Each structure stands twice: as C-alpha cells, then as structure tokens.
Amino acid sequence: MIEDTLVLIKPEGVQRGIIGEVIARFERASLKIIGLKMVLPSEEIADAHYPVTEEWATSLTNKTRESYTKKGVTPPKVTDDPMVYGKQIQSWLKKHLKSGVIVAMVVRGNCAVEIVRKLVGSTDPKSAAAGTIRGDFSIDSYDLADSERRVIQNVIHASSSVAEARREIAVWFSKLVTYY
C-alpha cells in the first residue's frame, strides 16, 4: 500500500549536518521525497504538531511509569492528572522543536510509515540498533534528558501511524507535488 509519512529532522540533526545522509537512506530504501523544506517552527505550528489529547496524555503517562519501573526506579511524583503531565511534556517538546531550524519532509512509498520507522530506529538512542538513523547519530539518553527536565534529543521524528501521518502532513504542508 502506497503511503505518505512525515519526517522531521530536528534542530540537533540539522546542526550536525546529517540532512543529506537521512534523505539518502530513505531513497536507498526506494522511498520518494515528495515534500521538503527547512523551517524555523512557529508557536502555532508547534502547537498543531503536538496537540495534547486525553488519549495521548494517558498513553504518555503510562509509558513513562513503565519506563521507570523497567529501570527499577520510582518515578518522580509530578501529578496524578495525565493532562497536567501531558501539558508539561508538550511544553518541552515545543521548546525543543522551536529551538532551531528543522527539515520537514513527506516521504512516500509502499508501507512508508513502517519502513521509515525501521530506518529511524527506537526513540531511545541507547536502544536504537546500529545502522538506524538514531543508532548512528543520536548521543542523548532518557536518563540525561530526565535529569535536565527536557525531552530527548534523538535527531529525527517520524509519524507512528498512517492516521498520524495524515494529520501531521496537513500541519506542515499545504501542497505536495508528485514528480515521478
């Protein structure tokens, strides 16, 4: 099934000069770049990219608790309200997204969402396999990010589902051109 997905090379990825390498990896996997731009995200774009919904906030809260439990660490007591926690994380995500120029691109191909996610690797750079974008280029960790009360800097964002890709593409691109 031919799909479109959104990829953002985050500020640390742009600063490290890996834009061409990221694009080359997608193209070597027979994926097409059908939208591409460099942008300094506005507050409005960051809000639209990271909307706080009850479902997202609850999922985030549960994942965070599970992560601490796996490490054998008691999670810090922040709040029992997932929406309050979600809004705090959203503010960190937005701050990071707006901290520098990013590259936004739409990638098209057969099973593009799944293939891009495999090429990108785990969101946790320590768990990302060698040969994935995060495994090769990320140097951050959740432990360090948590200790500094910020989001992890893992160089790249990729939509996690076809539905999420549709929503995110609409945030970043008003028009796409098929050139092939």
Q: What is the predicted role of each segment?
A:
Residues 1-180:
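Non-catalytic terminal and connector segments of soluble metabolic enzymes
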